[in-house]
């Protein structure tokens, strides 16, 4: 009888844990959705109030001016 109660308890615990896992993943936001924090997004990246794979910094281009100035001083 004890074995039956233990296995039923484990089975119910497994169902509860699976439901928690499904609910946790269902609450995340897809790419392009509005966000305030990274944990709200499925990919854990909130950039400029939108869920995204990576952040782009408009207006900041990668220039080698600093490197060229460094080599020019030598």
Swiss-Prot record:
Tissue: Expressed by the venom duct.
UniProt keywords, alphabetically: Amidation, Cleavage on pair of basic residues, Disulfide bond, Secreted, Signal, Toxin
Propeptide stretches in the record: 62-74
Domain characteristics, as noted in the entry: The cysteine framework is XI (C-C-CC-CC-C-C).
Secreted is among the record's keywords: yes
Record protein name field: Conotoxin Vt11.3
Cystine pairings recorded for this chain: 28-42, 35-47, 41-51, 46-55
Family according to the record: Belongs to the conotoxin I2 superfamily.
GO cellular component: extracellular region
Subcellular location, record wording: Secreted
Source species of the chain: Conus planorbis (Planorbis cone)
Signal peptide location: 1-26
